């Protein structure tokens, strides 16, 4: 298999390249009876889209979803849902000079070694353009999770370079192009990115995602762990080089008396586990974080080799994000939502007759960040 499909009971397959005629996905396993219309995809797709601000790629795509199958008279039918988005703003000529060169830090070299051929236009299949369809598929998952279980999945930029939020408000996140939780810092972020763009360099970032309302019991032990599948899904996002669940790598310096999440009849007293213990949800907010590397497409010259093995200097033209993390929150939300829906369907299939167990400990403190 080509590993273009993920999920078990909810299986999502994506297809298409950055500069091809279209990108698309097939969602197999969505229960019937969910109301779904093409216009419902617009909000999240615009949140992910390039061209939202001067701090992202200038490529502007309409990202209009065509529902090809799986929906009849506004309701899902239980059959595969096929979605298609036409590419309309490709500029393939920008990549003519690097068609035979390997851009450092990109998948050019590894795709060439694996397949013996590659599509150099905008990165082809390895482009973040592919994540558009993950976000589209997650529109279905988010709606089903919210209606069926009251689950919400929200993400935000929690670090830009060395800059961290100095405050937090969910309401601030959707009111600025950075998905930043502290509105007072946005002007400083604007100035930082303006200077970075003028320098021709790029920078990394961190994104946090919080899923609230997840019932205790979702997930599986050992090989189907909820945190394991979340980590795999998030690592499948372009440019992600690290994933944390809850306290994550901070756990290495904690004592057991600090890290353990004490329980009372009124709820948990902390959430260092990030809402998952033993691969199974505790009922607390699920907290995951990803680290994204700096964009490797730079207009600054760098050393590389071409397909003949000769040393060359590469300068990448085209339209690129100076920080891919700025558009990553909707993508990270999407992967979390798709994993949660798949796990919910699997839990219902195996354990639907178990019922609600007692005691069911309230989520308690419901910490936003595991470190708070």
From Swiss-Prot:
Pathway participation: Metabolic intermediate biosynthesis; chorismate biosynthesis; chorismate from D-erythrose 4-phosphate and phosphoenolpyruvate: step 7/7
What EC number is given for this enzyme? 4.2.3.5
Q: Can you name a GO cellular component term?
A: cytosol
4Fe-4S listed as a keyword = no
- HAMAP family on file: Chorismate_synth
Name the UniProt record assigns to this protein? Chorismate synthase
Question: What CDD domains has UniProt attached to this entry?
Answer: Chorismate_synthase
Instruction: Tell me which Gene Ontology terms the entry assigns under biological process.
Output: amino acid biosynthetic process; aromatic amino acid family biosynthetic process; chorismate biosynthetic process
Give the multimer and partner information. Answer: Homotetramer.
> Which co-factors does it depend on?
FMNH2
**What family name appears in the similarity comment?**
Belongs to the chorismate synthase family.
Q: What does this protein do?
A: This reaction introduces a second double bond into the aromatic ring system.
Catalyses which reaction?
5-O-(1-carboxyvinyl)-3-phosphoshikimate = chorismate + phosphate
What the entry lists under Pfam families is as follows: Chorismate_synt
Say yes or no: keyword Electron transport present: no
GO molecular function annotation: chorismate synthase activity; FMN binding
Q: Which UniProt keywords apply?
A: Amino-acid biosynthesis, Aromatic amino acid biosynthesis, FAD, Flavoprotein, FMN, Lyase, NADP
Q: What does the record note about the cofactor?
A: Reduced FMN (FMNH(2)).
Lineage of the native species?
A: Bacteria, Pseudomonadati, Pseudomonadota, Gammaproteobacteria, Lysobacterales
Q: Which residues bind NADP(+)?
A: 48, 54
> At the top level of its lineage, which domain of life is listed?
Bacteria
Residues reported to bind FMN? 125-127, 238-239, 278, 293-297, 319
Q: What class of enzyme is it?
A: lyase
